[in-house]
Amino acid sequence: MKIKNSLKALKARHRDNRLVRRKGRVYIINKQNPRFKARQG
């Protein structure tokens, strides 16, 4: 999982990326291609 300050560019890398909020953190998840997972930090 990548940890980035800004997820906007990462979200645009794949059309199946989803932006989700869990426990106060912001994540990018991708069921089709899990290598795009990222967390904002």
From Swiss-Prot:
Q: Does the keyword Ribonucleoprotein apply?
A: yes
Gene Ontology BP, a term: translation
Regions annotated as coiled coil: none
**GO MF assignments:** structural constituent of ribosome
**Entry keywords, A to Z:** Ribonucleoprotein, Ribosomal protein
Question: What InterPro entries does the database record attribute to this sequence?
Answer: Ribosomal_bL36, Ribosomal_bL36_sp, Ribosomal_L36_bact
Gene Ontology CC, one term: ribonucleoprotein complex
Q: What PANTHER family does the database record attribute to this sequence?
A: 50S RIBOSOMAL PROTEIN L36 2, LARGE RIBOSOMAL SUBUNIT PROTEIN BL36B
Instruction: Give the family, as the similarity comment puts it.
Output: Belongs to the bacterial ribosomal protein bL36 family.
From the Swiss-Prot or TrEMBL record, give the protein name.
Large ribosomal subunit protein bL36
State the species of origin.
Answer: Allorhizobium ampelinum (strain ATCC BAA-846 / DSM 112012 / S4) (Agrobacterium vitis (strain S4))
Question: What does UniProt list as this organism's lineage?
Answer: Bacteria, Pseudomonadati, Pseudomonadota, Alphaproteobacteria, Hyphomicrobiales
